[in-house]
Amino acid sequence: MDKLKKPILTEKSISLLEKRQYTFELDKNITKSEAKKMIETHFQVKVIHMNSYYLPINKKIRKNIGKLKRKKRMIFTLKVGDSIPFSSINMN
């Protein structure tokens, strides 16, 4: 679970929960197959689809501060009837 950093709870990600889509921030080196296996084994759910993306880096900030870490997020779509209760998500 070291590569699975935290769940993302933004307005958009909360609206995706109605479609059984959960958003997590992940380690940037994790692959889709590793992430799928990790979610399925840890939460005992079936993942049917995944989308991954990197958050954009603001060039103005990058120029002043230097190189920033890119953050990788994945959206997992679960099988009908499956859900991840937020009480079981412990990212400490």
From Swiss-Prot:
Top-level taxon: Eukaryota
Keyword Ribosomal protein: yes
InterPro entries: Nucleotide-bd_a/b_plait_sf, Ribosomal_uL23-like, Ribosomal_uL23/eL15/eS24_sf
SUPFAM superfamilies: Ribosomal proteins S24e, L23 and L15e
GO molecular function term, any single one: structural constituent of ribosome
Keywords associated with the record: Chloroplast, Plastid, Ribonucleoprotein, Ribosomal protein, RNA-binding, rRNA-binding
Location(s) in or outside the cell: Plastid, Chloroplast
Single GO cellular component term: ribosome
GO biological process entries: translation
Functional note: Binds to 23S rRNA.
Family: Belongs to the universal ribosomal protein uL23 family.
Self-association state and partner proteins as the record states: Part of the 50S ribosomal subunit.
Name recorded for this polypeptide: Large ribosomal subunit protein uL23c
